[in-house]
Amino acid sequence: MEPHHDGHILKVLPMLASNENFSRLTTAFVAGIAAHIIIFRRGEWDIAAARIPVGLFILQSCLFSYYLFVPGPPTSIYTALWLVGQITLGFIAGTTVSILSYRAFFHRLNSFPGPFPARLSMWYVTSLYAQNPDAFNTVRGLHQQYGDFVRTGPTELSVNHPDALQAVHSGRSECTKGPWYSMLHPFISLFAIRDKAEHSRRRKPWELAFRPNAVLEYLPALEKGTNELLEQVERRKGKSMDMTYWINLFTFDLTGRVAFSQEYECVKHNKRHPIMEINDSSNLVTGVVSHVVWLISFIKATPGLNANMKALIGFSEEQVQNRQKMQTSGQRDVFSWLWEDFKEQGMETPQSKLDLVADASLVIFAGSGTVAVTIIGCLYFLTSTSPDYLTQIRQELDTLDEINSHTLSKVQTLNAVINETLRLHYPALSGFQRQTPPGGLHIAGRYIPGNTNIKIPFYTLFLDERNFAEPEKFIPERWTTRKELVKNPEAFAPFLLGPYNCLGKSLALMQVRHVLVELIRRYEIVLAPGADPEKYWRERTDGFVMGLAPLDLAFTEREMAGF
């Protein structure tokens, strides 16, 4: 067998050297360059990426058939395969060389500084996130090295200028959502809609679901969930409790009740729902690979690799189906508003069903995670760095005639602690992708070309001395009695701005305030023996929502005043 194999190799070498083969390779190489310039440079190819190999295979099959069956001297299967391989190699080489040359030397973003490999491919920033779980610190380092405008990808900029938030995210901005939001296509949630008109239409039932009166209807669910959490704390008084674990159970349970009137009973049974494990692993993977949006297309289409994604979507479908079967006694939940709008549209299509499932997924996984990160962050600061604020909050609570969502919104120190936690412990550290309008965008006098993907790294922005004095210190007074420490109020918008702002803000804040107050007024809260707050801080990870290490606290009962 070996001599026969060597004979084939010896035959191949002169074939490569022949003028005919060189001409064929050159033609394919030039065709690859032309394909990049004429086709692949136009529009977005991210969500269509999985179809490109299919198209290439079809072309290869046509070429193979041509060489095998075209009239003329007979061509062996081996020779036909060799010729098709030559053309394919030349075409791919031409396309690749053209793409890399264009990005490295001729691209419209070449005037922006940044690591040279970032010009060539999003694999560079992907590798940063893969190697550094706290990639938000790495991005901050890039800005310290290169300045306010950093090229982090072939068509992507990271912008940390104080004016950037208003220019990119405000209501007057012409920026739209970028290709990142299409990665779960054809499942399109409200969060993923890139067309502003469609987003405005789909947003209406959400606005009804989160208006003040509707939010108050969710209060019984919040109280029930809080009581279940308090029961678990009561059983473990004086013992170590991992509040990262317990608060995540609490918010997941709460999301089930508020969104679908479903009972997951994670807190009650001290057990994580299986879907939480899948969501956690997906969150970590998403933080790494989502920078290469086209790769998500391949993952979605590949059996085995798409198992987690299918499980998350399947769970969301199950919640929708279960909720549709339920008969509620006038009690509203978030899904009831979405379902009502779905029926009123009167046009049930395959896409509208997918969108409904996507919206369900948005409520379940985005809502519970961000609230949990905020509550846990508050507990971290109140026990690890600034326990004196616990006393201040209790003193302010003691002055209230009653505790309810309205009075808690006025408790100065509590709300200052929440704001400062959102600044230093923001759930979405790396920000949200936007795309500049076709005519481009000016930020601080710097022109950014049209159709450029742009991200504002909130972690870096919130630690910028141009925006906040003593930015790395936890100082809640900057939101109350020392407002001079907030140098640029317009640089702080944790719930975003404009048409894409967070509709669930009032519900999220009600949840955070309620559970914190019930814990603070009932218990003395301290770090558990052996707890390592520095390890907690050091092990934060970047993802769709920030990943957190265990936060071990101990609770001992205290006397409550007046309630």
From Swiss-Prot:
Q: What is its EC number?
A: 1.-.-.-
The record's annotation in SUPFAM superfamilies points to:
Cytochrome P450
In the record, what terms sit under GO molecular function? heme binding; iron ion binding; monooxygenase activity; oxidoreductase activity, acting on paired donors, with incorporation or reduction of molecular oxygen
Q: Which residues cross the membrane?
A: 20-40, 52-72, 80-100, 362-382
Question: What's a BP term from Gene Ontology annotated to this protein?
Answer: mycotoxin biosynthetic process
The GO cellular component terms are: membrane
- Record's protein name: Cytochrome P450 monooxygenase phqL
